[in-house]
Every structure is written in structure tokens, then in C-alpha cells.
Amino acid sequence: SLEANTGNKLYIQDDLRGKNVDAIKALAAEKKVSISWTPKKTLSDMTGGAVHQGFVLRVSEFAYSELSVIMDKAEQEENPLILILDGLNDPHNFGSILRTADATQVTGVIIPKHRAVGVTPVVAKTSTGAVEHIPIARVTNLSQTLDKLKEAGFWVFGTDMDGTPSHKWNTAGKVALIIGNEGKGISANIKKQVDEMITIPMSGHVQSLNASVAAAVLMYEVYRNRL
């Protein structure tokens, strides 16, 4: 985040010393970010108890992308994959999904404005910086957005217990993949717009995978088929 020019104040643990600290101080000076030496307990309070390693960067409000920017980017790619998160609530899941999305060259991510997690400091940290590299659009109406994607030639896929096994999934062309809410899955009105449901074959005792793990398996399936 410091490299990406999104920070406006850096808090460093007041008893921290070493080469890493010197390097980060130099980068902060280069980026014109002010530094505040802060007690460890205060840093822990600021991060809600999350691991901070002695550094907390206050960032400007996240700059979301326009849907049109993601769709224009998709037009430049041979086999674009757009990820749609339908009502995801856990910031750790969101951050983890973004991290995998960056690794698998996902074109862009679309999330709803309401009843879903947005890009928060926890999301940014869990994504290990991926938020700076993937366009993320926030839309008011997910259903209308799916209509626009279909008009642009995208096939819309969802995840469900009953569907085409992921290893038999035809991922050619323009792919829009919907990942549902952690508990309820894909909402009923959105399900109606799905062209094909995909299921991840499982042989164990549990019935489902964590949302970020399921998303990762399917993103890698698309990525593998492009290699």
C-alpha cells in the first residue's frame, strides 16, 4: 500500500528498530507519508487485534473501479474471467479471494453495494496488496449487471451442490463466475440468471468448502485451462 501511494500516515511501533524499519522510513519519506511512533498496544487496538508486525498504514478511502472499466479490460483479453461476489460478508474471505484472483489473472471483481463487505483495511491486509492490482467495481443492482455481462457475450456460471463437475467445466470464451454468500449461497433471484451451475467434486464427510477455498479452486480451473 505504501508503494501504491494509497497511504497518508504510517504508525510504527515505538520500540522497533532495524534495517526493515530504516527501509520503510525511507520509502515513507519518498512517498511523503508522515510517521507516528506509537506504542504496540495502540497499534493492536487500531487493527482490532490483527497481526501488524509493528507497522500500521492509514490509507485513503479505497478507489473502486467503474463496471465499464472492467468490461473494457475484458474486451482486450482473449479469455476474460470476471468474478462476482454475491453477498460475501467475511472480510478475510474477500481478501483471500482477491489474493487468488491476482495470482490467476482475473480480469476484475464485482461486488454489490448493499448487504456485502466492501474493501476494508482487513480486506486489504488479507489480500497482501492484491487490492491495488485488481479492478473492483461496486454495483447497486447485481441482476442488471449480469444482464450487461450477458449482452457483452459472457457466460454466467454459479456454484452449487448439484451441477457440472468442475473438471468437466467448459471455460472457453468470456466467463463470469458467481461466488455466493458464506451461509446462504447464491441468492434466488441471481440463480435464475445463471447459465450453468458448477460443483466441486468432494469425497469426504463435509458438505461444502469455505467460500474463499471454493473460489480459489474454480479460479485455478479457469487459469489452468488457459495455460
Spans of features found by a protein language model:
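Structured adenosyl-cofactor binding patch, chiefly the S-adenosyl-L-methionine
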Residues: 125-128, 188-227
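N-terminal positively charged helical leader segments and presequences
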Residues: 1-72
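Histidine/lysine/aspartate-rich catalytic loop segments that bind and position anionic ligands
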Residues: 107-161
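Amphipathic alpha-helical repeat scaffolds
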Residues: 89-96, 141, 209-214
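Short, glycine/polar-rich helix-capping loops at beta-to-alpha or helix-loop-helix junctions
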Residues: 116-122, 184-193
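Hydrophobic, well-structured mid-protein blocks that either form specific transmembrane helices
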Residues: 80-128
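Short beta->alpha connector loops at strand-helix junctions that form conserved
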Residues: 13, 39, 86, 112-113, ...
